[in-house]
Amino acid sequence: MKIMQINLVDYKEWTESLGYDREWKIQNFQHGFLSRLNEIAAEINSFIITYRYDSYIMLLDGVLIGKNDYILTKIKELSPVPIDICFGYGKTLLDAERNCSINMDNILLAKDEKVLVAHFDLDGFSRKRFLFDAYLEVYKIYNKLFNYAMELGGLAYYFGGDNIGIFLGVDNINKVIELANSFPNMKVGIGIGNNPREALKNAAEALHIIRIYRDRKIEIVDSKN
């Protein structure tokens, strides 16, 4: 599987240069920057995952790597600090992240893999009366999914609200179904696509099917071609 890692160089030093009354400025930049990164990624059928606001992972399977210069130009226009990138390829997304290198040759020659996204949707979340109790419940589930995804070499990502995604290779489909069955109050839409955006779209369609028929809690939508 393939990734590009985008790092903001000397980001901490830049935040400290904003003065003491800076936290609102930092938050404003971080959310705005991520919003634009998501738009750029969507243009090339990719998706952005981040666990910290000075480093981002762009999923590249099924994405035209030749658009690299376009991506970098766009990102550099948005960033207040220099950008450093590396490319990773491996059997799993975790392997790809750990094999990250500035050399593009290996990733250009590597085969594109299909992308699997399991979109977990917690039942009854919106009916919970207390905000913090609801958040704590989602956080506990996210922590479990994060650790399980890591064991399989995948990445878990919190989409917001009661929605959590796991990104993996398609060879993990049976393990994902087994995991989904271990949560009694969870709908799980599994999308398989030729690129990250397509896989996410298929996962959303799978959830829609679950909501319509109400006789299942797991559904799979696969782009066969």
Swiss-Prot record:
Keyword annotations from UniProtKB, A to Z: GTP-binding, Hydrolase, Nucleotide-binding
GO MF annotations in UniProt: GTP binding; GTP cyclohydrolase IIa activity
Source species of the chain: Sulfurisphaera tokodaii (strain DSM 16993 / JCM 10545 / NBRC 100140 / 7)
Annotated gene: gch3
Role of this protein: Catalyzes the formation of 2-amino-5-formylamino-6-ribofuranosylamino-4(3H)-pyrimidinone ribonucleotide monophosphate and inorganic phosphate from GTP. Also has an independent pyrophosphate phosphohydrolase activity.
Enzyme Commission numbers on file: 3.5.4.29
Protein name (record): GTP cyclohydrolase III
Keyword Hydrolase: yes
GO terms of biological process kind: biosynthetic process
InterPro entries tied to this protein: GTP_CycHdrlase_3, Rev_trsase/Diguanyl_cyclase
Cystine pairs: none
UniProt key word Hydrolase: yes
Family according to the record: Belongs to the archaeal-type GTP cyclohydrolase family.
Reactions accelerated catalytically: GTP + 3 H2O = 2-amino-5-formylamino-6-(5-phospho-D-ribosylamino)pyrimidin-4(3H)-one + 2 phosphate + 2 H(+)
A Pfam family reported for this protein in Swiss-Prot or TrEMBL: GCH_III
